[in-house]
């Protein structure tokens, strides 16, 4: 809720919000801001799982490890001493061909902020502590980790810099994650 109150201070979000806007020669167009999906993309824990409709982006996240202390990704390079299950990775994908009116998946890439667009982001909501591994439209592709390939994918994405462009929300989202309290405005929004 704190992130949502922050977003409402942005002039474009404040103007459009979640509303219909009359577009000449088109008619009414619904503008929707996925606050929870955006929060997840900026590192705020939510019930949303990030997907991408770009294979290079998905591959980057499948072959890298994230260090929360340094806030950097590094290529995952297995050595001969790792456990068998750590030698394999998984690439999750959302099967759009399964007929289902699933509203858990929605695009984030067309937003007013850089990061979701750079990652071709999709948000998938996991309601009620559901397990991603048993969701009918979520499929898995297993692969064997290879250090050379991990480094190649990592370097092709400029060590992640292409996926994490700096924008106005990055610093603010980090501040929100460090808070142990919330504003009254955020609490009131959450309580609705």
What kind of region is each of these model predictions?
Residues 1-192:
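Catalytic-core elements of nucleic-acid end-processing and repair enzymes
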């Amino acid at each position: 809720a704190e992130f949502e109150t922050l977003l409402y201070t942005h002039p474009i979000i404040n103007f459009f919000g979640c509303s219909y806007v009359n577009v000449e020669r088109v008619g009414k167009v619904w503008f929707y801001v996925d606050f929870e999906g955006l929060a997840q993309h900026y590192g705020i824990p939510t019930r949303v799982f990030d997907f991408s409709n770009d294979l290079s982006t998905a591959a980057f996240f499948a072959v890298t490890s994230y260090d929360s202390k340094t806030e950097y990704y590094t290529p995952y390079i297995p050595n001969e001493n790792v456990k068998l299950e750590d030698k394999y990775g998984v690439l999750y994908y959302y099967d759009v061909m399964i007929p289902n009116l699933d509203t858990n998946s929605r695009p984030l890439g067309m937003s007013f902020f850089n990061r979701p667009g750079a990652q071709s982001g999709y948000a998938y909501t996991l309601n009620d502590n559901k397990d991603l591994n048993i969701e009918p439209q979520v499929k898995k592709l297993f692969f064997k980790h290879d250090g050379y390939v991990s480094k190649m994918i990592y370097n092709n994405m400029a060590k992640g810099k292409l996926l994490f462009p700096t924008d106005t929300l990055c610093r603010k989202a980090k501040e929100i994650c460090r808070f142990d309290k919330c504003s009254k405005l955020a609490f009131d929004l959450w309580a609705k």
